[in-house]
Amino acid sequence: MMLFAVISDIHGCATALERALDLCENTFHADCYLLLGDVLYHGPRNRIADGYDAGKTSQLLNSIRGRVIAVRGNCDAEVDQMMLQFPITADCNQIPFCGHRIFMTHGHLYDPSVLPLEKGDLFLSGHTHRVRNEVLENGVRCFNPGSLSLPKEPSYGTFAVLDEKSIRLINLDTAETVLEQPLWN
């Protein structure tokens, strides 16, 4: 069974990323990492996260580069691409998944209600630093895993793990599943 780790809004926080990678590798055994943008830089409106180290964050991500699919966030710049050994400049990416489609984007450009998505498709986004788990009228599930390093809601860092049956929201500090959502209900 394929397992995706879904991570957003790292903002260069090496300590949070190191913890997430440890959990993803050793507890959840992730096959692939879906990065939803805002990878290295915190941007002018965010505070600098505790543990901020863009160089170390790059090294950690480059160590799994063959298993990363990423999209650009509003704080990501072309110069960030020079630090990373996998593409991060696409505004969106689409992945076939269990007869449906995963549409991944950062969340500042695309409106899931106007995209050509169908019932059962999964719209993954970040950007708001707030967890979102909602099914639109057209049957598309919108999911935001929150922020790894600068969370707003909930107040702790989160990421998600996704397999063929469900998507689970994980508390970065405790490794506990705080939300589990079946995909096909």
Give names to the regions the model predicted.
Residues 1-14, 30-32, 142, 157-163, ...:
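Amphipathic repeat-derived elements
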Residues 181-185:
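Anion-binding (especially nucleotide phosphate/pyrophosphate-binding) glycine-rich loop
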Residues 3-97:
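Core catalytic region of metal-dependent phosphoesterases/phosphodiesterases
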Residues 86, 90, 98-103, 108-172, ...:
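Conserved beta-sheet core of the metallophosphoesterase superfamily
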